[in-house]
Amino acid sequence: MLISNTYNQHFPQLTQEQLARNATKKVICGMSGGVDSSVSAFILQQQGYQVEGLFMKNWEEDDDTDYCTAAADLADAQAVCDKLGIKLHKINFAAEYWDNVFEHFLTEYKAGRTPNPDILCNKEIKFKAFLEYAAEDLGADYIATGHYVRRAGDNENAKLLRGLDANKDQSYFLYTLSHKQVGQSLFPVGEIEKPIVRAIAEDLGLITAKKKDSTGICFIGERKFKDFLARYLPAQPGNIRTVDDEIIGRHDGLMYHTLGQRKGLGIGGLKNAGDEAWYVVDKDVENNELIVAQGHDHPRLFSKGLIASQLHWVDREPIRESLRCTVKTRYRQQDIPCVIEPIDDETIRVIFDEPQSAVTPGQSAVFYLGEVCLGGGIIAERI
């Protein structure tokens, strides 16, 4: 039996009754080959559950590229499962990923918006395809993942809470989940901080203990985003126009730029322009023009609110009256105090207490009441 003193210091000892109850439940833990899922599987074992792992392959890498680390990740996941003494199942969801995540990603970029495929992957793959496969084919009572979020309550009353580690909280990426999906999921590392996760992995001598966290979009990996996009979407160069209606340069394609972007515009050193940096303040998709302004505090960078659509509320109840809460318009952002005003069941108006910069159509706005993630939607337009 593997022992971790760090685990014993940070988790309460369960009663025999709790252990016996958990022993009747089968949990399929998504194993990514990273430290978070590795430690999640161990925690579940310590809590008495019947634990098995599942490695998902969601992307078919090209033979001539070495960006996708699927083979190495699978080897690490297998090594961890062998060490923990649990079975590892393998499943290929690449077709589902292409149809339900990647094609949407390309469509949004083509339309000049900036989508977040990781949110869609959680919605369509990890908490839909994986959840269904685990329940129907593997007989799971629960699935588990290494996400830094917490769950409160069961079944119809399940709520999604921020992870205990504020630096790692991933509730922003899981706002599309329903209370039913949350109720069928366990998030073992959501109750602890990242350094403790690594310490537990060190105690156990897991191969993933020092493995660096994966960054960026899963199917792009460490490669250059611009090079990757160019393989699927032909770039359409166009003019860079100032807010004063002056053309001052050319862009390679609107899809390569985001609101608030400062670097990589190639428009420095203009005569009579002063020293202040240029920022992207808008995209004119119709005319294929990038709109820029000087200064990090230019009014065009700021929005007093937003319109959001494609709404998902965790409790699946539409908001019918004004609600004061907080919102994040991008990951790792400080909470923004705001008021939600319903327009209809599918659309809301959000007014910030203070104007905010770089609110980006296509990204997600995610709402909170204290620790509870209420849900969110896609930013349709800035106000």
Swiss-Prot record:
Region of interest called Interaction with target base in tRNA, as start-end residue ranges on this chain: 116-118
EC number: 2.8.1.13
Pfam family, one: tRNA_Me_trans_C
Keyword entries, A-Z: ATP-binding, Cytoplasm, Disulfide bond, Nucleotide-binding, RNA-binding, Transferase, tRNA processing, tRNA-binding
Subcellular location: Cytoplasm
Region (Interaction with tRNA): 168-170, 330-331
Gene Ontology terms: cellular component: cytoplasm
Site annotation Interaction with tRNA: residues: H147, Q363
PANTHER family: MITOCHONDRIAL TRNA-SPECIFIC 2-THIOURIDYLASE 1 (PTHR11933:SF5), TRNA 5-METHYLAMINOMETHYL-2-THIOURIDYLATE -METHYLTRANSFERASE (PTHR11933)
Binding-site residues, ATP: G30, M31, S32, G33, G34, V35, D36, S37, M56, G146
Keyword Nucleotidyltransferase carried by entry: no
Protein name, per record: tRNA-specific 2-thiouridylase MnmA
Main localisation: cytoplasm
Organism: Haemophilus influenzae (strain 86-028NP)
